[in-house]
Curated annotation (Swiss-Prot):
Domain of life: Eukaryota
Binding-site positions, heme: C448
Main localisation: endoplasmic reticulum
Organs and tissues of expression: Detected in liver and ovary.
Topology within the bilayer: Single-pass membrane protein
Species whose genome carries this gene: Danio rerio (Zebrafish)
Gene3D superfamilies per the UniProt record, alphabetical: Cytochrome P450
Compartments where found: Endoplasmic reticulum membrane; Microsome membrane
Protein name, per record: Cytochrome P450 2K6
Transmembrane segments: 7-27
EC number: 1.14.14.-
Recorded name of the encoding gene: cyp2k6
């Protein structure tokens, strides 16, 4: 049983767990009553067990694959029970687009699982709803635009950080190393510059601890035991991974408090330097005006900062790691990218404006995002009202999982969905073509607010690193030996690996 196995792996007292489960099973059986609603209206799905739901047919180490497999049997819209929680699964480009884009208001709320409620308590951007979400998202978007997200100012920040990353890579002298840490330090510094208007040296222990905690939390959040905690929150005291996540979060909040206090000491209301400055200025204005119900409070500040770091670092770092690994795996594709960069740019620093003249490189970057598929389930949604989708009735407040893996690997949209193939984004003339089914940032009103910044980071880092280095497997390791099987957490990471960054002449 997935439930028992998950806790055995965590070393939890299984007798207590099984006893608690048995007790709740008895309570469930005695208290359950037949629904008065017509079940024929609902999407089909596997028959659930009392209390456990469909856990007996799910592999919680690879939940997204289990859900994808079930869609082959039950269709593009089906119901699954994660414990006692009823969830509607959406599969395939057409259905996911219909829900997230065409019915974006109806599918516009966030389903907030217990672990993310522990993180945010309804504050911030990523895991809030209603007026709080609307105001914090509006603030973040306008402030990010003010500080040049996706424009020249961001480009300058990124290019400056790329210089330091190249120096870090060069220190290894072409010998094998793990790319994760230097990339994580670099991307975290970019976010820190935008949020706090500070930059850390790569030797800074605070930066290392911040990066380490964020990575551990991303890994633990997708663990089987935390998934089970989300289904059975009363197991909280014995879920070690959940408690470690909360400890990491407290430590991060404490560190952010120190940074925010430092910002406050030098705050100039007429010259905001970053997101925290802008938030504090708005907070002061609301306080001076006597506004008692202002959303610009400390809870929203800390959670918004944490959301921006979480969303703005892990996804970009993970995608870049996949990109470099894939280039080492497929040296002929790497060579084509480098030939195009040499032909178009030469030896100067790549800039965003070069993208339109690098169709093959752009296609490779998009294919890295599609193939890596780092967020296969997507961020869970919740219906804001009763809604009909493809002939099925979905009740207000129903959790909905849009399977992005089913979009990025849709056989009706991609010629070779399970292969790494940059031709997916090229026409017969070799020109770049963007596909509607390309949804790595999600879609609709909950689409990632940092998409333009992430796209800029991916392009500039990828082109700059491939211009300067050739990436190869370590000595004694062939391209075929490089394993593309992902490590499952909240996102899909490459397995731990080392590459050689050989300086190009």
């Amino acid at each position: 049983m997935a439930l028992i196995e998950a806790f055995l792996l965590q070393g939890s007292p299984t007798g207590t767990i099984l006893g608690a489960l048995l007790l709740f099973l008895v309570i469930y059986l005695f208290s359950s009553s037949s629904s008065s609603q017509d079940k024929e209206k609902y999407p089909p799905g596997p028959k659930p067990l009392p209390l456990l739901g469909n856990l007996h047919i799910l592999d919680l180490k690879k939940t997204y694959l289990s859900l994808l497999e079930l869609s082959k049997k039950y269709g593009p819209i089906y119901t699954v029970y994660l414990g006692p929680k009823k969830v509607v699964i959406l599969s395939g480009y057409k259905i996911v687009k219909e829900a997230l884009v065409n019915l974006s208001e109806e599918f516009g709320d966030r389903d907030i699982s217990p672990i993310f409620h522990d993180f945010n308590r309804g504050y911030g951007i990523a895991f809030s709803n209603g007026e709080n979400w609307r105001e914090m998202r509006r603030f973040a978007l306008s402030t990010l635009r003010d500080f040049g997200m996706g424009r020249k100012r961001s480009e300058e920040l990124i290019i400056e950080e790329i210089k330091y990353v190249k120096e870090e890579f060069e220190k290894f002298g072409g010998n094998p190393f793990e790319t994760k840490l230097p990339l994580a330090l670099a991307i975290s510094n970019i976010i820190a510059s935008i949020v706090f208007s500070v930059r850390f040296e790569y030797s800074n222990t605070k930066l290392h601890r911040m990066v380490g905690r964020a990575y551990e939390n991303m890994k633990l959040t997708g663990s089987p035991s935390v998934q089970i905690y989300n289904m059975f929150p009363w197991l909280r005291p014995i879920v070690a991974n959940r408690n470690q996540i909360v400890k990491n979060l407290r430590d991060t909040f404490k560190q952010n408090e120190e940074l925010i206090n430092g910002v406050m000491k030098t705050l100039d209301p007429f010259n905001p330097r970053g997101i925290v400055d802008s938030f504090l200025i708005r907070q002061q204005k609301d306080e001076e005006s006597g506004k008692t119900d202002s959303l610009y409070n400390s809870n929203n500040l800390y959670c918004t900062v944490n959301n921006l770091f979480g969303a703005g670092t892990d996804t970009t770092v993970t995608t870049l790691r996949w990109g470099l690994l894939l280039m080492a795996k497929y040296p002929e594709i790497q060579a084509k990218v480098q030939d195009e960069i040499e032909r178009v740019i030469g030896g100067r620093q790549p800039v965003v404006e070069d993208r339109k003249n690098l169709p093959y490189t752009d296609a490779v970057i998009h294919e890295i995002q599609r193939f890596a598929d780092i967020s296969p389930i997507g961020a869970p949604r919740q219906t804001t009202c009763d809604v009909h989708l493809n002939g099925y009735f979905i009740k207000k407040g129903t959790p909905v999982f849009p399977l992005l893996v089913s979009v990025l690997r849709d056989e009706n949209e991609w010629e070779t969905p399970d292969s790494f193939n940059p031709k997916h984004f090229l026409n017969k003339q070799g020109q770049f073509v963007k596909k509607d089914a390309f949804m790595p940032f999600g879609a609709g009103r909950r689409v990632c607010i940092g998409e333009s910044l992430a796209r800029m980071e991916l392009f500039l880092f990828f082109t700059s690193l491939l211009q300067y280095f050739r990436f190869t497997p370590p000595p004694g390791v062939s391209e075929d030996d490089l394993d593309l099987t992902p490590v499952v957490g909240f996102t899909l990471n490459p397995k731990p690996h080392q590459l050689c960054a050989v300086k190009r002449s």
